[in-house]
Amino acid sequence: MVNIIFNFKNTIILFISFIFAAEDLVYDVSISGTIDMGLPHYIERVVNQAETNGASIIIFEIDTFGGRVDAATQIKDIILDSKIPTVAFINKRAISAGALISLSCDSIYMTSGASIGAATAVSLDGKKASEKVISYMREEMATTAEANNKSREIASAMVDEELYIEYFLSASGDTIT
């Protein structure tokens, strides 16, 4: 199974790269593990370097359970401000802060079995955050989705478990993240 996912990942990256001429420069950036305050500086440096070097596209390979909302918001702003087309490639998961980062990219591609969502804000002790914080995060996700012509409703539902999107339930009626 690992081999199949690895080959599929390489196929997707190869396909995206092939869309551009052979001489075009493609940046492949890994975002994995916990989203922390060191990551925005790295992403900003990579995006600036890609712009300086005339890259045609930046592919962000995402595999994270999330992390700090402030760091993810900074990364989102950097990606939205990029002059280069951006792609989120979700190899396994883009949970919570990872979902926000993915939504900031121009396009999202996922491997079979990958997941995105589960972005309900929580406090440092792991409990559900206040309605004020949830409202902020819901709007942050929604406006980010809208910026790239993605569904505001689906992005909002990733944050607010009270929201119901009928056509995104499994055959058994379970919520799909």
Locations of regions flagged by a protein language model:
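Sec-dependent N-terminal signal peptides
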Residues: 5-21
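Soluble extramembrane regions of membrane proteins in the secretory/endomembrane system
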Residues: 22-177
